[in-house]
């Protein structure tokens, strides 16, 4: 930074809250926060001056080896602050003055640097901190609200800082130029509510979800991480994804989360300096996990059988019922499954004497287009018995045109295609049988009590071992040339044999996963509190 003088006015009598400047905000006094921010911004402590009316604040300045001026009669307001400050700094040689106040504690040294760089671009101007305002204003005509006037070009001054040159102010010929502070940092402490909000924001931790998903891999990891992120409201949540996974980035962005698309995930994550990193990327490597841990973050992995898992703080392998690796940091099986939020209020099915609707669903992408294959297999059975066919496919399903063409040409019209819908549970609640892939959807089917035929997309899915007959599933395995005959046989039996279907229904109805997510998120967030206590 150029040799400017940073002046921190700290007037005790002007405080909105008693002893505001020496009151601890998240463990650090307001004046000390301002000093720390100024020190991070300045080249050295000699560039900082505190002017105050308080003995306590003068002592704090001394302890920080910062110059101060104390005047018990000092009083400042928005109209006189610049002139009063100028009168107190006449002996200082610096021409550029950065008047920085302590009552906006969310503003950091990077914000001050950006503001000063902007100031250096100006001539004959004073830079003023402001925040944007959007106003929807109505006039009243004959006691009624008239047409509103929407204003998006407004801004409001906040008392964070002024930057000016002595000579410009003395000549009294200058313009006031706005420097816009982002909304999330523009809170000015004027009352206890402002204090409470600032403290809550400062206490937030940074949680980074490292995820992937595309046509080949599927979107299960994305939807799983989103369901967890929805439960984390007291901390900052950021998603990091390799830029090649465009489908994943688009899905996350649609949920209004901050998502960083990058070619170098490791560097991006380290630069973010997270308090907690959640990896939902399958098998991790040792070096990657060690680097994150060395950077001070706690690490939680999902569905991880890689060597990096041994070095994580928690590893949830919820899709595997039997432990495959040893370690106290591993958690196995369906009691660690978390369902999407829509299932929180979904109603599990009661047993129905006959089958009126069937569900086909093979994940968000269905790279093998099992959807169309299964539709062709069961169509004649459904048509003969007047069974409605519900097809659910995700936003990444690239065979949509093919299946729409097939449906349009079919003589049977009780076929419904639900593409990228947000309420799959509603379709499930109408269905008595399902045919599905062996991903996370099997737990959703179990939650709604739907006996299901399961076909695995690939070997990794095949190794997921929850979907067994003892839990109400008919697991066909991976698709082979004999799969068509097996599916037709098992589907016909489910439709025709009520006792067989009832037996499977009783088995599957024993399971509920609704409470799991809260417990999992609580366990994950406890790591942050633990790391906070240790530090």
Task: Locate the predicted segments by residue.
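Conserved core of the sugar-phosphate nucleotidyltransferase
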Residues: 78-84, 105-184
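Acidic donor-binding loop of glycosyltransferase active sites
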Residues: 429-440
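C-terminal alpha-helical cap of glycosyltransferases
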Residues: 3, 118, 191, 513-535
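N-terminal nucleotide-binding beta1-loop-alpha1 segment
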Residues: 1-18
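Donor-nucleotide binding loops and adjacent catalytic segments primarily
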Residues: 245, 357-430
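Conserved donor-nucleotide binding/catalytic region of nucleotide-linked donor-dependent transferases
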Residues: 480-511, 530
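A nucleotide-sugar donor-handling region in carbohydrate enzymes
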Residues: 172, 176-197, 312-369, 399-401
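Short phosphate-binding loop-to-helix
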Residues: 49, 55-99, 106-114, 261-273, ...
